Amino acid sequence: MKKILLLIAALMIACLAAGCGDNGGKESSSSPETKSATISEAKESSGVQGNFAGKRILIAYFSRADENYRVGYIEKGNTRILAEMLAEMTGGELFEIKTVKSYPKEYDTAIEEAKQEKESNQRPEIAGKLPNVQDYDMIFLGYPIWWGDLPMGVYTFLEKEDFTGKTIAPFCTHEGSGMAGTEVFVAEATKAKMLPGLAVEGTVAQNSRDKAKEEDRKSVV
């Protein structure tokens, strides 16, 4: 599990250092670069935590547990797994973008409801108090790809917050679509500085955790 996290953090840090993905708050004519991650691609990286020393990091994510595609019924959503790994590495604060109305437990029923929300351009109400993103130096934004788009609740979050002068590093879980161009949607909704998006297959995040933990344990013994 930590190897995926190291790849995510290393890519984001490299982009921060190089100033990648800066559109100056303007819409870009081309999509930001997208990285796709697998366990085998993850490389060990040293000093990752130090890059975030003294910085306030917010890791806002939307995730759904229950029945999911190709992984069956799960207690922890795929995107939540990645968000928690990022929090462990960066010391960032987690915020779950959770809608007041829960989605059905069954996968087919849930994605049909999500499709209806997308087609009618709904903005589901978010449960709980929202964080003030102006209090943070950087925001990681995580979500699953639903119907080639962000979950509508993520739009609710983005439109209620003020991202002026902020940097957003998007990451997603998917089963073949990659980022699906959602980095552009985030940029349009926030006018924030965007870093390249990172896409991780949901089955990798969900099913490879034990294997990754064992590989990581061997590497430090």
Residue ranges and their predicted role:
Residues 15-19:
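C-terminal motif of bacterial Sec signal peptides marking the signal peptidase cleavage site
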Residues 106-193:
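Helix-loop-strand module that forms the ligand-binding subsite of alpha/beta enzymes
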Residues 1-4, 8-9:
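Positively charged n-region of N-terminal signal peptides that target proteins for export
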Residues 93-95, 193-201:
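Short beta-strand elements in bilobed, periplasmic/extracellular small-molecule ligand-binding domains
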Residues 75-82, 86, 150-154, 182, ...:
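Stable alpha-helical elements in mature extracytoplasmic
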Residues 220-221:
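Conserved small/polar residues in nucleotide/adenosyl-binding loops
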Residues 64-67, 99-103, 145-149, 174-179, ...:
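Solvent-exposed loop/turn segments at secondary-structure junctions
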Residues 21, 31-136, 148:
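N-terminal beta1-alpha1-beta2 submodule of the flavodoxin-like/Rossmannoid cofactor-binding fold
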